[in-house]
Swiss-Prot record:
Protein name: CDP-diacylglycerol--serine O-phosphatidyltransferase
One Gene Ontology cellular component: plasma membrane
EC class name: transferase
Compartments in which it is found: Cell membrane
Organism listed in the record: Mycobacterium tuberculosis (strain CDC 1551 / Oshkosh)
Transmembrane segments: 15-35, 74-94, 95-115, 135-155, 167-187, 207-227
Record keywords, A-Z: Cell membrane, Lipid biosynthesis, Lipid metabolism, Membrane, Phospholipid biosynthesis, Phospholipid metabolism, Transferase, Transmembrane, Transmembrane helix
Enzyme Commission number: 2.7.8.8
Length: 286
Protein backbone atom coordinates (compact mmCIF):
# COMPACT_ATOMS: atom_id res chain seq x y z
CA UNK A 1 0.00 0.00 0.00
CA UNK A 2 1.39 3.34 -1.03
CA UNK A 3 1.23 5.85 1.75
CA UNK A 4 0.19 9.43 1.24
CA UNK A 5 3.05 11.81 0.57
CA UNK A 6 3.94 13.88 3.55
CA UNK A 7 3.06 17.51 3.31
CA UNK A 8 5.78 20.08 3.29
CA UNK A 9 6.56 21.23 6.79
CA UNK A 10 5.79 24.82 7.48
CA UNK A 11 8.41 27.21 8.66
CA UNK A 12 8.74 27.15 12.42
CA UNK A 13 8.17 30.75 13.41
CA UNK A 14 9.66 30.13 16.84
CA UNK A 15 13.14 30.54 15.36
CA UNK A 16 12.28 34.08 14.23
CA UNK A 17 13.40 35.84 17.45
CA UNK A 18 16.77 34.06 17.43
CA UNK A 19 17.14 34.82 13.71
CA UNK A 20 16.58 38.51 14.45
CA UNK A 21 19.21 38.36 17.18
CA UNK A 22 21.72 36.77 14.80
CA UNK A 23 20.95 39.46 12.21
CA UNK A 24 21.63 42.12 14.84
CA UNK A 25 25.04 40.54 15.52
CA UNK A 26 25.77 40.58 11.79
CA UNK A 27 24.79 44.25 11.63
CA UNK A 28 27.03 45.10 14.57
CA UNK A 29 30.06 43.29 13.17
CA UNK A 30 29.50 44.80 9.72
CA UNK A 31 29.52 48.23 11.35
CA UNK A 32 33.12 47.54 12.38
CA UNK A 33 33.96 46.68 8.76
CA UNK A 34 32.55 50.00 7.53
CA UNK A 35 34.42 51.89 10.25
CA UNK A 36 37.68 50.27 9.10
CA UNK A 37 36.82 51.42 5.57
CA UNK A 38 36.31 55.01 6.83
CA UNK A 39 32.56 55.01 6.32
CA UNK A 40 31.29 56.23 9.71
CA UNK A 41 27.78 57.03 8.46
CA UNK A 42 27.22 53.44 7.38
CA UNK A 43 28.71 52.19 10.66
CA UNK A 44 26.35 54.36 12.71
CA UNK A 45 23.36 53.26 10.62
CA UNK A 46 24.20 49.60 11.19
CA UNK A 47 24.55 50.11 14.94
CA UNK A 48 21.11 51.74 14.88
CA UNK A 49 19.76 48.76 12.92
CA UNK A 50 21.27 46.38 15.47
CA UNK A 51 19.61 48.34 18.28
CA UNK A 52 16.22 48.17 16.54
CA UNK A 53 16.53 44.42 16.03
CA UNK A 54 17.61 44.02 19.65
CA UNK A 55 14.52 45.89 20.81
CA UNK A 56 12.19 43.81 18.65
CA UNK A 57 13.46 40.27 19.16
CA UNK A 58 12.30 40.01 22.76
CA UNK A 59 8.84 41.33 21.92
CA UNK A 60 8.52 38.95 18.98
CA UNK A 61 9.56 36.07 21.26
CA UNK A 62 6.82 36.96 23.74
CA UNK A 63 4.20 37.29 20.99
CA UNK A 64 5.12 33.91 19.49
CA UNK A 65 5.59 32.32 22.92
CA UNK A 66 9.10 31.39 21.79
CA UNK A 67 11.05 32.44 24.87
CA UNK A 68 13.86 30.07 25.77
CA UNK A 69 17.04 29.97 27.82
CA UNK A 70 19.12 29.68 24.66
CA UNK A 71 17.43 32.73 23.17
CA UNK A 72 18.16 34.73 26.31
CA UNK A 73 21.84 33.73 26.20
CA UNK A 74 22.14 34.64 22.51
CA UNK A 75 20.50 37.99 23.20
CA UNK A 76 22.97 38.73 25.99
CA UNK A 77 25.92 37.86 23.74
CA UNK A 78 24.45 40.04 20.99
CA UNK A 79 24.25 42.97 23.42
CA UNK A 80 27.91 42.48 24.33
CA UNK A 81 28.88 42.58 20.65
CA UNK A 82 26.52 45.29 19.40
CA UNK A 83 26.65 47.69 22.34
CA UNK A 84 30.07 46.87 23.78
CA UNK A 85 32.62 45.71 21.23
CA UNK A 86 31.20 47.45 18.15
CA UNK A 87 30.82 51.02 19.52
CA UNK A 88 34.23 50.75 21.18
CA UNK A 89 35.98 49.70 17.97
CA UNK A 90 34.04 52.14 15.76
CA UNK A 91 34.95 55.05 18.04
CA UNK A 92 38.56 53.90 18.32
CA UNK A 93 39.04 53.55 14.57
CA UNK A 94 37.25 56.81 13.80
CA UNK A 95 38.54 59.13 16.53
CA UNK A 96 40.90 57.64 19.13
CA UNK A 97 43.47 55.58 17.24
CA UNK A 98 45.96 58.49 17.20
CA UNK A 99 46.52 58.35 20.96
CA UNK A 100 47.74 55.41 23.10
CA UNK A 101 45.18 56.25 25.79
CA UNK A 102 42.44 55.78 23.20
CA UNK A 103 42.73 52.01 23.33
CA UNK A 104 42.69 52.06 27.13
CA UNK A 105 39.40 53.96 27.39
CA UNK A 106 37.55 51.95 24.72
CA UNK A 107 38.80 48.75 26.35
CA UNK A 108 37.45 50.03 29.67
CA UNK A 109 34.09 50.73 28.05
CA UNK A 110 33.83 47.27 26.44
CA UNK A 111 34.72 45.53 29.72
CA UNK A 112 32.16 47.62 31.63
CA UNK A 113 29.44 46.65 29.15
CA UNK A 114 30.23 42.96 29.69
CA UNK A 115 30.21 43.42 33.48
CA UNK A 116 26.95 45.33 33.31
CA UNK A 117 25.31 42.57 31.24
CA UNK A 118 26.61 39.89 33.62
CA UNK A 119 25.09 41.76 36.57
CA UNK A 120 21.80 42.14 34.70
CA UNK A 121 21.63 38.40 34.06
CA UNK A 122 22.42 37.67 37.70
CA UNK A 123 19.67 40.02 38.90
CA UNK A 124 17.17 38.35 36.58
CA UNK A 125 17.66 35.12 38.52
CA UNK A 126 17.59 36.83 41.93
CA UNK A 127 14.28 36.09 43.61
CA UNK A 128 14.96 38.47 46.50
CA UNK A 129 14.46 41.65 44.46
CA UNK A 130 11.52 43.86 45.54
CA UNK A 131 8.43 44.03 43.33
CA UNK A 132 9.31 47.45 41.88
CA UNK A 133 12.82 46.38 40.80
CA UNK A 134 11.60 45.25 37.36
CA UNK A 135 10.78 48.89 36.57
CA UNK A 136 14.40 50.04 36.80
CA UNK A 137 17.78 49.22 35.35
CA UNK A 138 20.70 49.10 37.76
CA UNK A 139 23.16 51.41 36.05
CA UNK A 140 22.98 52.65 32.48
CA UNK A 141 21.68 49.99 30.06
CA UNK A 142 24.05 48.83 27.33
CA UNK A 143 22.06 50.37 24.42
CA UNK A 144 22.13 53.77 26.13
CA UNK A 145 25.88 53.39 26.59
CA UNK A 146 26.24 52.70 22.86
CA UNK A 147 24.24 55.84 22.02
CA UNK A 148 26.50 57.83 24.35
CA UNK A 149 29.58 56.52 22.54
CA UNK A 150 28.21 57.11 19.06
CA UNK A 151 27.20 60.61 20.14
CA UNK A 152 30.88 61.54 20.13
CA UNK A 153 31.13 60.53 16.49
CA UNK A 154 27.91 62.44 15.77
CA UNK A 155 29.49 65.64 17.13
CA UNK A 156 32.40 65.26 14.73
CA UNK A 157 30.10 64.54 11.80
CA UNK A 158 27.96 67.59 12.59
CA UNK A 159 30.53 70.20 13.62
CA UNK A 160 33.90 68.90 12.43
CA UNK A 161 37.02 69.20 14.57
CA UNK A 162 36.98 71.07 17.89
CA UNK A 163 37.44 70.65 21.63
CA UNK A 164 34.83 67.89 21.45
CA UNK A 165 37.28 65.80 19.40
CA UNK A 166 40.20 66.32 21.79
CA UNK A 167 41.64 63.27 23.50
CA UNK A 168 40.89 64.75 26.93
CA UNK A 169 37.19 65.27 26.28
CA UNK A 170 36.81 61.91 24.53
CA UNK A 171 38.58 60.10 27.35
CA UNK A 172 36.50 61.89 29.98
CA UNK A 173 33.23 61.09 28.21
CA UNK A 174 34.01 57.44 27.56
CA UNK A 175 35.23 56.94 31.13
CA UNK A 176 32.11 58.62 32.51
CA UNK A 177 29.88 56.42 30.38
CA UNK A 178 31.77 53.34 31.56
CA UNK A 179 31.27 54.33 35.20
CA UNK A 180 27.53 54.85 34.66
CA UNK A 181 27.27 51.38 33.12
CA UNK A 182 28.59 49.61 36.22
CA UNK A 183 27.14 52.05 38.75
CA UNK A 184 24.21 51.28 41.02
CA UNK A 185 22.20 54.31 39.87
CA UNK A 186 18.60 53.34 39.03
CA UNK A 187 17.37 54.24 35.55
CA UNK A 188 13.83 53.80 34.30
CA UNK A 189 12.93 51.08 31.83
CA UNK A 190 10.94 52.28 28.84
CA UNK A 191 8.03 49.90 29.42
CA UNK A 192 7.69 51.25 32.97
CA UNK A 193 7.31 54.86 31.82
CA UNK A 194 3.68 55.95 31.84
CA UNK A 195 2.26 59.11 30.31
CA UNK A 196 -0.87 60.73 31.76
CA UNK A 197 -3.71 60.86 29.19
CA UNK A 198 -3.72 64.67 29.11
CA UNK A 199 -0.10 64.60 27.87
CA UNK A 200 -0.69 62.06 25.10
CA UNK A 201 -1.22 64.69 22.37
CA UNK A 202 1.95 66.53 23.36
CA UNK A 203 3.92 63.27 23.31
CA UNK A 204 2.67 62.47 19.79
CA UNK A 205 3.74 65.95 18.66
CA UNK A 206 7.22 65.40 20.13
CA UNK A 207 7.47 62.04 18.36
CA UNK A 208 6.52 63.71 15.06
CA UNK A 209 9.23 66.32 15.58
CA UNK A 210 11.77 63.59 16.34
CA UNK A 211 10.78 61.74 13.17
CA UNK A 212 11.39 64.89 11.13
CA UNK A 213 14.68 65.54 12.95
CA UNK A 214 15.83 61.99 12.18
CA UNK A 215 15.76 62.97 8.50
CA UNK A 216 16.86 66.61 8.66
CA UNK A 217 19.35 66.61 11.55
CA UNK A 218 20.08 63.04 12.68
CA UNK A 219 23.33 63.88 14.49
CA UNK A 220 21.69 66.62 16.55
CA UNK A 221 18.81 64.26 17.34
CA UNK A 222 21.28 61.80 18.84
CA UNK A 223 22.41 64.48 21.27
CA UNK A 224 18.85 65.49 22.10
CA UNK A 225 18.25 61.85 23.05
CA UNK A 226 21.47 61.72 25.11
CA UNK A 227 20.67 64.93 27.00
CA UNK A 228 17.06 63.87 27.62
CA UNK A 229 18.24 60.52 28.97
CA UNK A 230 20.79 62.13 31.28
CA UNK A 231 18.14 64.55 32.56
CA UNK A 232 15.80 61.68 33.44
CA UNK A 233 18.32 60.10 35.84
CA UNK A 234 17.58 62.34 38.89
CA UNK A 235 13.86 61.70 38.45
CA UNK A 236 14.47 57.95 38.21
CA UNK A 237 16.51 58.05 41.43
CA UNK A 238 13.76 60.00 43.17
CA UNK A 239 11.07 57.63 41.90
CA UNK A 240 13.02 54.56 43.01
CA UNK A 241 13.57 55.99 46.49
CA UNK A 242 9.90 56.89 46.83
CA UNK A 243 8.82 53.39 45.80
CA UNK A 244 11.27 51.84 48.25
CA UNK A 245 9.61 53.84 51.04
CA UNK A 246 6.03 52.99 49.99
CA UNK A 247 5.64 49.20 49.58
CA UNK A 248 1.87 49.59 49.71
CA UNK A 249 1.85 50.94 46.13
CA UNK A 250 4.16 48.36 44.53
CA UNK A 251 1.25 46.56 42.89
CA UNK A 252 -0.71 49.70 41.99
CA UNK A 253 -1.09 51.08 38.50
CA UNK A 254 0.76 54.31 37.52
CA UNK A 255 -2.41 56.40 37.81
CA UNK A 256 -2.98 55.20 41.36
CA UNK A 257 0.66 55.85 42.27
CA UNK A 258 0.43 59.41 40.99
CA UNK A 259 -2.66 59.96 43.13
CA UNK A 260 -0.83 58.67 46.21
CA UNK A 261 2.15 60.94 45.52
CA UNK A 262 -0.10 63.98 45.10
CA UNK A 263 -1.85 63.17 48.36
CA UNK A 264 1.52 62.75 50.07
CA UNK A 265 2.71 66.13 48.81
CA UNK A 266 -0.46 67.82 50.00
CA UNK A 267 -0.08 66.21 53.42
CA UNK A 268 3.61 67.18 53.66
CA UNK A 269 4.07 70.38 51.65
CA UNK A 270 7.59 71.05 52.96
CA UNK A 271 10.41 68.87 51.76
CA UNK A 272 12.86 67.40 54.31
CA UNK A 273 15.69 69.29 52.62
CA UNK A 274 13.93 72.59 53.34
CA UNK A 275 13.65 71.69 57.01
CA UNK A 276 17.32 70.71 57.20
CA UNK A 277 18.38 74.01 55.64
CA UNK A 278 16.09 76.04 57.87
CA UNK A 279 14.06 77.36 54.94
CA UNK A 280 10.55 78.66 55.43
CA UNK A 281 7.65 79.67 53.26
CA UNK A 282 7.79 83.35 52.18
CA UNK A 283 5.70 85.56 54.44
CA UNK A 284 5.75 83.11 57.33
CA UNK A 285 6.90 84.45 60.68
CA UNK A 286 9.78 82.84 62.52
Amino acid sequence: MIGKPRGRRGVNLQILPSAMTVLSICAGLTAIKFALEHQPKAAMALIAAAAILDGLDGRVARILDAQSRMGAEIDSLADAVNFGVTPALVLYVSMLSKWPVGWVVVLLYAVCVVLRLARYNALQDDGTQPAYAHEFFVGMPAPAGAVSMIGLLALKMQFGEGWWTSVWFLSFWVTGTSILLVSGIPMKKMHAVSVPPNYAAALLAVLAICAAAAVLAPYLLIWVIIIAYMCHIPFAVRSQRWLAQHPEVWDDKPKQRRAVRRASRRAHPYRPSMARLGLRKPGRRL
